Amino acid sequence: MAGRWFTFGFFLGLAVVFFSWPGAQLAQASCGAVSCFVTIGSQQQVAMEGLLTVNGIYNYTPMRLLPGTNGVIPGLDTNQRQMILDHHQETRTITQTATLDLNYGLTERLGLEITIPYMVRTHHHIDGLGEDGPNGEGQSTTFSSDGIGDMRVGVKYNVLPTLRSLVVFGFGVYLPTGVTGANDSTGALMEPTTQLGRGQVGLNPTIYQTYELIPHRLNEFAFGGYRHTFRNNVGYQFGDQWDLNGGLNLVTVPWLVLSAQLNYRYIVHDNFSSSLSRSATPADAPDFPGEPVVIDPTIKNRQVPTTGSTFLGFTPGFSVNLGQMIESSWTRMTSLYFYSSIPMVRDSNNSLAQGTSFIF
């Protein structure tokens, strides 16, 4: 465990060093297992030709049950290609991500972006409802994993560069570099939704826009993104994801910018190629607790009923321009920022929902 946190701390420290490197810059700020999604302008803009901008980002995203939900969801056995209804009861997930984001200007309008996330994820649920325990109450199971997540490589093109506005189209590809074979505390393979990687390539077109309402004082920004992940080798396909963000930045003094944004995310249901069973219930006595009851042995594409979610959050924050406060080669064009994403509306289909998240 000590080695795991040393590795995470080393990566986070490395990210902070890069974030402070001359040339790192901020213009605005978007936020698994989901991860917080906040819009950071220096990620979305195209760097000047020949210039490398570097962002070091840490985000903390807790997920817990919403009031009025019980967290009972299907169990997914990828080895046997089996979906078992009402087999798990979710408790919590915490995801911490340290991201190194690199942007390089190929031309005045065309840029290259590489995003490298390092993740630490912990998860707890009750496994084997109707199957384990003297009364079918299941078994407490924990999961912890750390490592590189799915990297993203993309290009961006600035189609409308003016003194007061920007419109940037982007297209990225998520590479299956994240861990997909981690086990839980019982030694069983953990389900795809909790692994650090998705195990398959994903496509991610984006659009980013900003306009100075009051030059050098107040600007608005908007971001839209879509992510499609192809079915992986264990028959699992994550649902398509839509992100929409919009907000304002106010320059109070040259070194302090206040920001506020709304963040909306919609994720459709996941799909799993599997047979279908259900957990045993007291009505199945004397075979209770007992093995899951088969409903349909045919392996075919099935919607995972408790996946998919809707999230609307409000994210206040601020950024500090170190170059305006301290004149040195290490602080020139360098900014620090902090954001807190506060949930306003959430629907997670009886599963875990994103809580208040922090990004800096």
Give the location of each predicted region:
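Residues that define the transmembrane beta-barrel architecture of outer-membrane proteins
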Residues: 50, 94-98, 137, 141, ...
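Repeated loop/turn-to-beta-strand initiation elements of outer-membrane beta-barrel proteins
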Residues: 110-114, 153, 163-167, 215-220, ...
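Long, hydrophobic/aromatic-enriched structural stretches that serve as scaffold segments
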Residues: 82-154, 158
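Transmembrane beta-strands of outer-membrane beta-barrel pores
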Residues: 58-64, 116-122, 159, 173-179, ...
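Residues on the lipid-exposed face of transmembrane beta-strands in outer-membrane beta-barrel proteins
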Residues: 42, 56, 100-104, 114, ...
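Outer membrane beta-barrel transmembrane domains
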Residues: 67-69, 73-79, 234-360
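Outer-membrane beta-barrel biogenesis signature
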Residues: 21-79, 179, 323-330
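Extracellular loop and loop/strand-boundary signature of outer-membrane beta-barrel proteins
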Residues: 41, 84-88, 136-143, 190-195, ...
